[in-house]
Design a protein with these regions (language model features):
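Active-site phosphate-binding/coordination module
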Residues: 28-124, 221
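Mg2+-dependent phosphoryl-transfer enzymes with acidic/Ser/Thr/Gly-rich catalytic loops
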Residues: 2-7, 27, 172, 179-260
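Conserved acidic, metal-coordinating active-site core of Asp-based
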Residues: 108-199, 203-212
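Hydrophobic "anchor" residues
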Residues: 19-20
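A general structural motif
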Residues: 7-9, 42, 68, 130, ...
Length: 260
């Protein structure tokens, strides 16, 4: 891709844990660089996390990240505007975002299938909501995951299964993941995917990187499952630095920041 033909970045969608969060000085560096951008012209800032929406907003305050314009929570199953931001005023009612998840989905059935398996452990209630069933499953083989998919299908469910970090298993409605939620938001905002940059570190970020035309930043501490995506892909930048410093490095590469 010829750099000069790329459109300016209009939106940053970043994961939190292991990406913008995980190294306090790096997080602070990102915050100062972001806040130095002209508020009228800087990209829309979206935090796209497996955490639930309220938890994201509390966590952002806790670690000192800049306030987001929007949050996508629950691995693409929740969408919210932040607290006290006038930028939300022009945004249409968010409730219709979740209406698309109902078909083929039953939380009770999902929980029954996963709860019947011997190696799965239900994650705490703080990680669960109406369209996200989250479990711990250590070092699952592809065969074990395929077996779970079959069991869910046999129960009449139409779901997306996301396994990341060799531990975290999220069962979501078929039309839910971080990438699809981001694409929906961009469409509502009138922002093209070729004006978007995404950042992440694990497999549950993969769907963001797969959006056609979107640019990416894979931080140096990313798991192999995501690092492999960046090979031979000119739209995905592999940072040499980890955590938020890697995001800063990537934003220099994509011309959002002038320097690191």
């Amino acid at each position: 891709v010829e750099r000069r033909r790329l459109k300016p970045i209009a939106l940053l969608s970043s994961d939190l844990d292991g990406t913008l969060a995980g190294d306090a000085p790096a997080t602070s560096r990102f915050r100062s660089k972001w806040q130095a951008l002209d508020p009228e012209h800087r990209p829309v800032l979206v935090y796209n996390s497996g955490r639930l929406a309220d938890d994201i907003l509390n966590f952002v305050d806790e670690v000192g990240l800049p306030a987001p314009d929007y949050v996508i929570g629950g691995v693409g199953t929740m969408l919210a505007g932040p607290r006290h931001t006038p930028r939300l005023a022009h945004f249409p009612e968010l409730s219709h975002f979740a209406q698309r998840f109902s078909e083929g989905w039953s939380l009770d059935k999902v929980d029954a299938v996963l709860g019947s398996l011997k190696d799965t452990v239900r994650q705490p209630d703080g990680y669960q909501h109406a369209f996200k069933s989250s479990w711990y499953l250590l070092d699952a083989s592809p065969e074990a995951l395929a077996s779970i998919e079959r069991a869910l299908a046999e129960a009449g469910l139409s779901v997306t299964m996301v396994y990341s970090s060799g531990r975290d298993l999220d069962i979501l409605p078929r039309s839910a993941d971080k990438g699809q939620a981001l694409a929906w938001l961009c469409n509502e905002l009138g922002i093209g995917l070729d004006e978007v940059v995404v950042a992440g570190d694990t497999n549950n970020d993969r769907s963001m990187f797969e959006l056609p035309g979107a640019r990416g930043i894979v931080v140096a501490n990313a798991l192999p499952e995501l690092l492999d995506m960046a090979r031979d892909n000119s739209l995905i930048y592999s940072a040499k630095t980890p955590f938020a410093l890697g995001v800063v490095e990537g934003l220099v590469h994509w011309s959002v920041f002038a320097d690191a």
